[in-house]
Amino acid sequence: MKRAVNCGLVKADNMKQAILLLSFGTPRQPSDLLPYLTSIRRGKIPTERELKVLTARYDAIGQWDNKLLQTMGEEQKKTLKSLLAIDAMYLAYLHMPNSMEQAIESIATAGYTSILCIVTSPFYSMIGTGAYERKLHSILRAYPDISCEIIKSWWNRPQFFEYWRSQLMAANPLQADTACIFSAHSVPTSTVGSYEDEVMSASNQIAKMVGLNHWYQAWQSAAPYGEWLGPTIESVIEQALIDGAKRIVCIPFGFVSDHVEILYDNDIICRNIVENAGATYERVPMPNGNTLFMEAMAKAIRERINK
């Protein structure tokens, strides 16, 4: 099929293509927490105690007064849209408005016949990117004239590694008393698939770029039920302290932005473990809308469109 170049991207003739950025979503006000958690739990309404616990966590990280935390997806969309130099860029959340249903309805109304989707999570897992994939397939049954592709992972791009290399190097990771702990979101052991191997491959590559001879891999933010991939970040921190570390540097490279699983699980829970042991806690900055980091996503999109 003949192809034509448009704004740095390539699309097939007679096909209008939209890019759909997919993200988890985050509550913007306390009243969002009930529908948000209910959606995460697939329609199961949380108990009053569960809501109280979650509210306390968001209160602790200053969620309700931090505009950037509330609009992170929009900021990432702006950066990605600028890098790709296109107008047909949409954003949808898995658990908050603007929902995936709303976004696809808007895309269809605008006349697009093809959608290329990318999830903010860099690694593919069945419960992560797979959840978006399954929901897309369900929604698109009502749109038989729209074709859809999803980029399942995009971590294996040089910009991804360069971002984390530069941030880790700035933390002086080679000091003798320092333990570097790489972490990604845990998943149920029954759904691991290739996720663990890909995450481990990435952490090994970052460590090699920095010159680390010894580091730790941990898994964090697991649900409080069922069997999840380990070791947990809490247990790894405790082991690093036993091994003699006086300074802990956390690298949550499986995540892309500041949110409750970083600002609470890492910066409050993990910090408390470290500081209660008399050691120093540090965490490298998250990418958020960093241009270098977002270029890894843009590169994956260009590659898919031009294949």
Regions found by a protein language model. Name each.
Residues L9-K307:
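Active-site-proximal alpha-helix that buttresses catalytic centers in soluble enzyme cores
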